[in-house]
Amino acid sequence: MAENVVQLNKSSQQDIDRKIAVIFVTDVVGFSKSMEVNEEETLRSFRACQEILDKLFEEHGGRIFNTAGDSVLAEFQSAVSAVVCANEFQKLIKERNKSVSEESQMSFRIGLNMGDVIIEGDNLYGEGVNVAARLEALSQANGICVSKSIVDFVNKKTELLFNDLGEQKVKNTEVHAYDIAAVSYTHLTLPTSVTV
């Protein structure tokens, strides 16, 4: 009986695919309110922004795992690539907002974390994902909030400045958070070969 239990536990562990990954979470600020005001225009604007994000994911190695409403969850193998992608996205959204009507403008929050995740089909689970979502909730509109694990890998590979927000309590969990200070898109560099 005990042997069967051990075999069952081993089988269950083998079915679970775990790895360290960089998690990218974003959503639209005030999406529900915008939908109440003008559903069609809000959806058109969101799709336009989503096309921008999809192209950036393709360029920087992001893999989309889940989308729900205005939220997007993606995974990167490189912390540097994820930060580059996030910054470029915010830059392009800022430029887009200058060229469209006020009701068509959109603002995004982004959270980035590197941690342990569980992969099951097209879904990601685990503490690594939860922390990224909490960081996204901490982010300012048009901002990017990242974990200490991201900063440790990215800090010496770019010229970005990070504001240390210290330990932030979100949903009964403390997260050491940073936000990107005065995002400098022109100075952001991506090494020719990068790893997490």
Please tell me what each predicted stretch does:
Residues 4-87, 91-92:
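Catalytic NTP-binding/metal-coordinating core of nucleotidyl cyclase/transferase enzymes
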Residues 51, 73-179:
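Catalytic beta-strand-to-alpha-helix segment of the class III nucleotidyl cyclase homology domain
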Residues 194-196:
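Acidic, Ala/Val/Gly-enriched low-complexity intrinsically disordered segments
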